[in-house]
Amino acid sequence: MYSISTAGIDLIKHFEGCRLTSYQDSVGVWTVGFGHTGSDVRPYMHITEEEAEQLLKDDLVRFEKCVNDLVKVDINQNEFDALVSFSFNLGTTF
């Protein structure tokens, strides 16, 4: 079972960017931190950098599990990180 590496997290953070005040994304979903969405995100809420980091780590657990459950071939850490980043960005609903 893989876990996302520090480099993988840094890549996600780089492409997501960090917004400490919630905003509506391009499809109208309230988002905060490094791309965190969900019922806990309220309009114009404010979080700290530390809270944004924790939300990202908590969010990634679900995507790590999904990638670990679905990938049935040997992959390396970089490939795993890329798949977690991809699923974090696009979701895992089929």
Predicted feature locations:
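Cell-wall polysaccharide-cleaving catalytic domain and substrate-binding groove, primarily
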Residues: 1-94
